[in-house]
Amino acid sequence: MSDKISFLPPEPIQLLDEDSTEPELDIDSQQENEGPISASNSNDSTSHSNDCGATITRTRPRRSSSINANFSFQKAHVSDCTIVNGDHGTKFAVWRITVFLEPNLKAFAAKRESYKIQTYKRYSDFVRLRENLLTRIKTAKPEKLNCLQIPHLPPSVQWYSSWKYQEVNLNKDWLAKRQRGLEYFLNHIILNSSLVEMTKDILIQFLEPSKRVA
């Protein structure tokens, strides 16, 4: 983060239902702008998949993307945000990112432990991630591009609302919509095995565990 920041007391804004253990991905509202993702129904869930190794399901992803020999990405959860004080009286939201991993080796799977990565990111970090991904896939062969589509991020504050930027950007409803959009974006990326294979170093750097600044 470019700003010198200090975290407020740990009282995250509650945007999700505490009773929900599995985050519901807001897929339907995104499909129109996100390329060829087809939907298929099963008995207990609604699944959206494509031919590029990505499957995003409302209850649980059916596939995972290998990040190394030991683990594959299983799903990402963008949860509570904390409002942070920046310089010059500014405030911004920092999101808690949890990425669950699925062990590839029986030795890890037998332990029945929950493997996950947790980090903290702000919206601008997602913007840089998307820019880096777009730059990387430009080097791909033309026939591969259909499998390397990068979804859009939830929108930033519109120019005509910039005069009240802080009020809009920290509004609870606005943050709830942004949370769903960021979660959709990240799951779309990490569950696309072709995209993960090509951008593995970028994703690993993005998911480096963060240290809170006192």
From Swiss-Prot:
GO molecular function: phosphatidylinositol-3-phosphate binding; protein-macromolecule adaptor activity
UniProt feature, compositional bias: Acidic residues: 16-31
Record annotation: effect of changing L15A: Disrupts interaction with VPS13
Outcome (variant: I13A): Disrupts interaction with VPS13
Effect of disrupting the coding gene: Decreases VPS13 levels at endosomal membranes and nuclear envelope-vacuole contact sites.
Key words of the record: Endosome, Membrane, Phosphoprotein, Vacuole
Region (Disordered): 1-63
Annotated localization: Endosome membrane; Vacuole membrane
Motif PxP: chain residues: 5-15
Identification of the protein by name: Endosomal/vacuolar adapter protein YPT35
